[in-house]
Amino acid sequence: MKVCVASPYPLTELKGNTVTTSRIVNILRGQGIEARGSYHFDGREADVLISLHAVKGVEGVRDFREKMPKGRVIVLLTGTDLYQSLPQGSEAGLQNLVDANRIVVVQEAAIRRLPVEVREKVVVIPASLDPISIEASPLASPFAISVVGHPRPVKRPFLTIETVARHPEWQDVEVWQIGEGLDEESRKTGEEWSQKEPRYRWFGGLPREESLKLCAKSSLTINSSILEGGANAVLEAMSMGVPVLASRIEGNEGILGEKYPGYFGEGELDGMLQAIIDKRVELRDWVDLARARLPLFSPESEAACWLELLTDLDYRQGQL
C-alpha cells in the first residue's frame, strides 16, 4: 500500500500541520507501509491520500481523485477546520467530508462539531508524542512562564504578558515567548512588549530541541488559545514534567482531561496566576495528573489506530 500524507503547508515550514505530517509518515513507515509526505498532493501514485485540513486540502483531494480514481481519501481534521472554517460554512470543506472515505479527529469531543450525516465515517486517533528525554528543571529564579507557539490571533499569544504587566508586584515573574512572528502585527506587538516590559523576553523561532530545553527551564507553561485542535506544545510540556495552565477549550481538555484543575476561563488568568504565585496551588499535582494521561498519546497507540484504519479501508476496497 502506498500512502501520501498531504500537508497544507510546505514541509520545510515548522508548523503544527507539518509536524503532524512528518509524524504520521514516520508511524506508517514503522508499520511497513510505503508512506511519504508532500505539500498538497504531489501527483505521484498512491492508494490512499491522508489530507490534513478539510478546507485547505480541497484542491489536493480533487487532484488525487482525478489521477487516482480508485484511491481512498482520509481527511484529518485540524483545529482550524473544527472551530473556524467549517462552523463558518465552508461549502467546499463540508463537501470534502461528505466525499471522504474516512474522517479522522484527535479527540471524541470533535465529533459533536460535525454534521450528523458524516459522523459514521469518523475515527478518533489521538495524536502521539515521541519520547522526550528532557526533564523539567525550572530555575530557582525568576519564576519563568513559557508561552510556546508561533503567535497567531486565535492563540492569544500576548495574553500572558498583558496579564503580568497589570501586576508590577510580581517582580520575580518573567514571560518567555517562544515562536516566530509570522506576520507584521505579531512582530510589532512582540517588539513593543520587549521594549516596554523588562519581564518579557521574546526568543523568536527556535529549533525544536532548543525550544524544548527552554520550556523545561520554565516554572509553568501557558496555552491561552481560543481554539485549538490539540497543541503539540501542551503534550511536550506534559512529557517533560512542566506544569500546564491552559484555556478551557475542547482541544486542551482532550489532552489534559476534563477534570484537570489547571484551566482558566475568560477573565480568570489573573486569579489563577496569583494563586500559583502565592503557592496556594500544588503544581506537582498538576504534573502528576497530566503525566498519567501520557499513555493515551503513545506512538504505539497511534500506530495501532492508523494500521487498523488502513487495513479496514484496504479490506473494504477489496470487497468492491
Which role fits each region the language model picked out?
Residues 16, 281-315:
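A charged, aromatic-enriched C-terminal amphipathic alpha-helix characteristic of glycosyltransferases
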Residues 97, 205-206, 213-218:
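Short alpha-helical donor nucleotide-sugar binding micro-motif in glycosyltransferases
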Residues 98-122, 126-132:
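A short, active-site helix/loop in glycosyltransferases that binds the activated sugar's phosphate group
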Residues 136-166, 175-178:
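Conserved donor-binding/catalytic core segment of Leloir-type glycosyltransferases
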Residues 188-209:
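Nucleotide-activated donor-binding/catalytic signature segment of Leloir-type glycosyltransferases, i.e.
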Residues 226:
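Aromatic "clamp/platform" in nucleotide-sugar-dependent glycosyltransferases that forms part
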Residues 243-246:
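Short hydrophobic beta-strand element within catalytic cores of glycosyltransferases
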Residues 258-268, 275-281:
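Conserved acidic donor-binding segment of nucleotide-sugar-dependent glycosyltransferases
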